[in-house]
């Protein structure tokens, strides 16, 4: 019964508010969907994006082996890394970069519970925005609902992984000075917080990649409900 009310509110609310873009196309879509399809399609897209991102990133080389999300040293520290490599400390630099990415890979599986929780708590307004929004509406939904609590959850895992590397302490010392001189963003002045932020960026980026696939080729997903809901938007 609750699901029925959700769907009726979603369909009628979107039609009345004119939130669709373009409105005529979205209005036609919303009126053509059978009861329950809208909510089911949106939840399926959310779940698919979350599971895909966590599965791809939360494993060995999920970050380190993917150039799109690999975590590098931040700007000004790349220059310091070059100096270290020139003095024979290249191995230490590589160890730090590897540790940063391994930390992100270890943290990402912890995201699944919160992402699933966000899907279950989706409101009627959230549903409207996702269905009639732009190409990144699923990604934006997850980021808005989970970024802060995931950051809290990721940080201890990242800290535990990076503190094993001696150069991490030097990173914080050098980065702290660089931030004090305005050469580095303050949020990047601590290796643990920097990696946590980049891990979240990578997670939402990969959710976005899956969202693009769903919107571009809903038939190719092999899901009848995704094909019906998102295929009608094309």
Residue ranges and their predicted role:
Residues 53, 123, 218:
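Residue-level signature of catalytic and energy-coupling elements of molecular machines
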Residues 1-14:
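N-terminal secretory signal peptides and thylakoid transit peptides that target proteins
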Residues 34, 38, 49, 92, ...:
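Helical mechanochemical/support elements of P-loop NTPase systems and associated helical scaffolds
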Residues 202-234:
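A cross-kingdom marker for long, charged
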Residues 90-161:
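Mid-length scaffold segments of soluble, non-membrane domains
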Residues 157-198, 202-203:
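An amphipathic alpha-helical core segment
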Residues 27-99:
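N-terminal Sec/ER secretory leader and immediately downstream segment
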Residues 21-26:
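Sec/Tat signal peptide C-region and signal peptidase I cleavage site
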């Amino acid at each position: 019964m609750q699901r029925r009310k959700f769907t009726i509110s979603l369909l009628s609310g979107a039609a009345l508010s004119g939130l669709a873009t373009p409105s005529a196309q979205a209005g036609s879509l919303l009126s053509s969907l059978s009861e329950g399809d809208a909510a089911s399609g949106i939840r399926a897209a959310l779940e698919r994006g979350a599971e895909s991102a966590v599965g791809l990133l939360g494993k060995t080389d999920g970050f380190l082996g993917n150039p799109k999300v690999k975590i590098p040293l931040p700007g000004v520290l790349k220059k310091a890394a070059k100096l270290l490599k020139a003095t024979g400390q290249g191995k230490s630099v590589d160890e730090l970069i590897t540790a940063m990415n391994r930390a992100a890979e270890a943290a990402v599986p912890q995201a699944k519970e919160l992402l699933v929780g966000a899907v279950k708590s989706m409101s009627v307004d959230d549903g409207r925005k996702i269905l009639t929004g732009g190409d990144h509406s699923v990604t934006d939904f997850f980021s808005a609902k989970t970024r802060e609590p995931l950051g809290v959850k990721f940080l201890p895992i990242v800290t535990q992984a990076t503190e094993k590397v001696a150069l991490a302490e030097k990173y914080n010392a050098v980065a702290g000075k660089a931030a004090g001189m305005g050469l580095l963003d303050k949020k990047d002045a601590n290796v643990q917080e920097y990696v946590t932020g980049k891990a979240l960026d990578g997670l939402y980026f990969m959710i976005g990649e899956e969202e693009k696939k769903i919107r571009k080729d809903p038939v190719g997903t092999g899901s009848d409900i995704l094909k019906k809901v998102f295929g009608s938007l094309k």
